[in-house]
């Protein structure tokens, strides 16, 4: 899907942009692997918000350290956004495990923080891509991320649960949406500050919760509702001048 989109969008094929895209893809593939390992073996109520806050925080620090200078309101928005990410990402352990409280062991902590760092590095990698390169860096990113996934599958072949054929159209649709979302993110990085784009992108759990309420009619906890409100405030603050 990403190759088709890149061919249609055009743009310059440069070694640097493809390399940054490839690096972002490797980091993203590792991030997804470790994140689901942590979710499968640890308490989601800890794993999810910790990962989300790490993902939101590291690119902000890197962006500011490398020259980003957001305005005062944007700085306030960044702080509110990081808090919002933690709130909307929080889940009860029973939601996923159906049991009490899995232990947050040192191995789970490594997977949790490691996945957050890897996601953040993926954001930072995309943020280094120059303008005029179209979606080719995204195609490069998806290629290396897919390679990581297949390597993981190869080393855990007996434990793999393959999707049924009836899910294929849904999976293709998800792939197309993923390309659209990440293409938009790539263009946002090319025309915005790493710190601001990353922290807004990290608010995606808020959109997931909002869609669950609107489309599925789910009820949200007070904590998540507070997180949704904080996310709205954060976006408004980052968008305002000064």
Model-derived segments and spans:
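Membrane-interface interhelical linkers
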Residues: 1-23, 35-42, 92-110, 144-173, ...
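Hydrophobic transmembrane alpha-helices of multi-pass small-molecule transport proteins
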Residues: 2-3, 57-61, 72-92, 223-242
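C-terminal transmembrane-helix exit sites in multi-pass transporters
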Residues: 9-10, 56-76, 86, 152-156, ...
């Amino acid at each position: 899907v990403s190759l088709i989109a890149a061919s249609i969008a055009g743009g310059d094929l440069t070694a640097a942009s493809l390399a940054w895209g490839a690096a972002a893809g490797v980091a993203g593939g590792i991030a997804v692997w470790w994140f689901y390992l942590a979710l499968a073996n640890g308490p989601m109520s800890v794993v999810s918000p910790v990962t989300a806050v790490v993902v939101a925080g590291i690119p902000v620090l890197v962006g500011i350290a490398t020259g980003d200078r957001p305005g005062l309101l944007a700085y306030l928005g960044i702080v509110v956004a990081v808090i919002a990410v933690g709130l909307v990402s929080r889940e009860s352990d029973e939601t996923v495990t159906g049991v009490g409280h899995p232990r947050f062991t040192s191995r789970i902590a490594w997977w949790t923080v490691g996945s957050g760092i890897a996601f953040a590095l993926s954001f930072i990698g995309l943020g280094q891509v120059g303008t005029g390169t179209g979606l080719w860096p995204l195609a490069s990113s998806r290629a290396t991320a897919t390679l990581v996934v297949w390597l993981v599958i190869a080393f855990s072949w007996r434990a793999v649960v393959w999707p049924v054929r009836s899910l294929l159209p849904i999976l293709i649709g998800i792939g197309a949406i993923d390309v659209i979302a990440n293409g938009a993110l790539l263009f946002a990085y090319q025309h915005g500050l790493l710190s601001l784009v990353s922290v807004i992108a990290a608010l995606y759990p808020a959109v997931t919760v909002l869609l669950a309420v609107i489309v599925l009619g789910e009820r949200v906890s007070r904590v998540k509702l507070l997180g949704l409100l904080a996310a709205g405030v954060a976006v408004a603050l980052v968008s305002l001048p000064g």
